[in-house]
């Protein structure tokens, strides 16, 4: 159906405000690599209008691409024909139950707004991402977002108590009760968490809340090598247990980029750096002394412990600005990978050696969540941009992913598969697993209208 005619028919049941005149903000993906074409953008302002839109599309066999904050990095919400259904107008905080430590929200709620709502009620919602000021809860769930606090609180899958989902036939499956235990058969919410919008459109969610942190200690540690970081992680997890919230790895080059971009001094001079954070829900005046003593006794004597909120913010700025610093240099080839923590040093050493032998001008920007085994293993070429870089992508990816698989890892730790990585899925999932995924997809979406050409290989 032609876009103009499609828009005209949608206007029969959607208001003008739900059919934005300016499509541009919804068409270009975050990395400016993929652009939606020949499609109509809709922003339903109610769950009922999401259902009406889905039923209309089912009747006319029109593809639907769900979209949250459009912050994804793998082309997961880019459409070629049909409808882009953006959830941004579904942005209410529906209910907070302090007794249940739960918050129920619309899928279009900005993550930061959920964090704020929880804080206003004396609670803490732990999901934390660089894009938290613009990403939406529905997208976080659809991609099973991870972020900075996985080490203590788990991924988004661990934070979801219940979901409300519009199925491809327009029916609504809703189980938003804040139950922490439920053994009545298959836990259907897990079908939709991490499904990247291919099975249903998440319209609402009930999420876990936690006690706020009363004590926070943040340290920056300089180390000679990654194996030393792994040893420190093992010891600190054993000593501080659940109080260890974050354990971030940063290479020397990644720090140099971020420090220059952020106009901040490098905290320490070392080949590898760790940013770690301890939190406690009780006031603890001795936690800093305990951390300092521990670091001195466990190879972390070359370290700084933040002495003020401003110093803590500066340390986190250095970590969080790495991606922005790299973007300012031009086109990157990015890898969102994970390997078992014990094999991280081997992966970094062997993969880096092979890449520099194959591409002498390559620059490696290595950082990420060592505490849970996931890394942002990024590359760029100082004198190349755009298509020139992408022509090298196949060879670079082949090397990186070969080492990931050799070390029993995954090619998608946090960002999902989307368009970018779907051809690689058979390398990390068995034929039987992919066949089962296809069977689930066909059962729920027999006409394959929801987020077509994503996730599953052609």
Where are these regions (language model features)?
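Small/polar glycine-rich anion-binding or flexible loop at a beta-alpha turn
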Residues: 253, 370-373, 411-423
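FAD-binding subdomain of flavoenzyme oxidoreductases
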Residues: 92-248, 450
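N-terminal accessory segments
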Residues: 1-31, 59-62, 295-312, 406-411, ...
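C-terminal substrate-recognition/cap domain of FAD-linked oxidoreductases
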Residues: 20-24, 207, 217-222, 228-392, ...
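Active-site cofactor/substrate anionic-group-binding motifs, chiefly glycine-
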Residues: 64-66, 71-73
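Activity-critical C-terminal alpha-helical subdomain
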Residues: 171, 422-458
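N-terminal flexible segment immediately upstream of the FAD-binding catalytic core
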Residues: 1-55, 72-101, 254-263, 309-333, ...
């Amino acid at each position: 159906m032609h876009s103009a005619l499609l828009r005209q028919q949608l206007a029969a049941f959607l208001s003008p405000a739900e059919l934005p005149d300016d499509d541009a903000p919804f068409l270009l993906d975050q990395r400016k690599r993929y652009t939606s074409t020949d499609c109509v953008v809709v922003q339903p302002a109610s769950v009922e209008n999401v259902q009406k839109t889905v039923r209309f599309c089912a009747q006319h066999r029109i593809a639907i691409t769900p979209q949250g904050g459009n912050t994804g990095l793998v082309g997961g919400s880019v459409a070629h024909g049909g409808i882009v259904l953006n959830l941004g107008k579904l942005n209410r905080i529906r209910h907070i139950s302090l007794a249940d430590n739960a918050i129920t929200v619309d899928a279009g709620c900005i993550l930061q707004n959920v964090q704020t709502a929880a804080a206003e009620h004396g609670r803490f919602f732990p999901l934390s991402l660089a894009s938290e000021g613009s990403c939406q809860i529905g997208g976080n769930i659809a991609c099973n977002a991870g972020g900075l606090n996985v080490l203590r609180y788990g991924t988004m899958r661990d934070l979801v108590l219940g979901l409300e989902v519009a199925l491809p036939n327009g029916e609504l499956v809703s189980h938003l009760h804040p139950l922490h235990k439920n053994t009545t058969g298959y836990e259907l919410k897990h079908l939709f968490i991490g499904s990247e919008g291919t099975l249903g459109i998440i319209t609402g969610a009930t999420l876990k809340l936690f006690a706020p942190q009363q004590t926070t200690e943040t340290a920056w540690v300089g180390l000679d090598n990654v194996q030393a970081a792994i040893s420190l992680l093992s010891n600190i997890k054993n000593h501080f247990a659940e109080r260890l919230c974050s354990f971030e790895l940063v290479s020397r080059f990644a720090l140099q980029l971020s420090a220059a971009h952020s106009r901040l001094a490098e905290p320490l001079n070392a080949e590898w750096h760790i940013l770690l954070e301890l939190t406690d829900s009780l006031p603890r005046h001795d936690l800093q002394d305990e951390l300092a003593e521990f670091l001195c006794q466990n190879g972390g004597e070359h370290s700084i412990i933040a002495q003020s909120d401003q110093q803590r913010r500066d340390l986190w700025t250095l970590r969080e600005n790495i991606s922005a610093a790299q973007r300012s240099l031009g086109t990157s080839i990015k890898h969102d990978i994970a390997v078992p923590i014990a094999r991280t040093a081997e992966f970094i050493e062997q993969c880096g050696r092979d890449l520099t032998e194959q591409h002498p001008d390559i620059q490696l920007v290595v950082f990420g969540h060592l505490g849970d085994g996931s890394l942002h293993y990024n590359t760029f070429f100082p004198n190349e941009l755009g298509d020139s870089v992408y022509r090298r992508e196949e060879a670079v990816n082949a090397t990186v992913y070969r080492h990931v698989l050799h070390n029993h890892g995954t090619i998608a730790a946090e960002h999902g598969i989307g368009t970018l990585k779907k051809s690689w899925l058979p390398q990390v999932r068995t034929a039987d697993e992919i066949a089962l995924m296809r069977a689930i997809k066909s059962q729920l979406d027999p006409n394959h209208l929801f987020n077509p050409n994503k996730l599953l290989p052609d």
